[in-house]
């Protein structure tokens, strides 16, 4: 019994003597997660970037929709708390890799970019906006499968 008690005391002493870098480790993990997220997320687009690069609806209501890159665009309007949005994210990321150089993909956090979401009457998430090279965009409200999105993108790329 004395030996068990001594072993417990020895282990506790060792535990107390080890440096506590838990806060530093937590900061490193958080930084690492942020780096991973940067590489595994679609680029965000702000209200101003949308006006500058896709469609300046504030100043010219007759302007045609276009992306300065000349490619079709897919925009994911989402919210961080939305489970279907989180489920949709990896599919969109895979499709953005598949159509790299052919279609531009962006995401819009509807809580951070309320003005942009309100401009298109986005009231439900997820909502995907598909903008062809020419013509009017169209919206898909609610979760849709990767296969369905792929079919829509194939149509966008045709024209």
State each model region's role:
Residues 70-73, 101-104, 133:
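Loop/turn elements at helix/coil->beta-strand transitions in domains of secreted/extracellular proteins
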Residues 124, 129-159:
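Non-catalytic, surface beta->alpha helical segment in thiol-disulfide oxidoreductase systems
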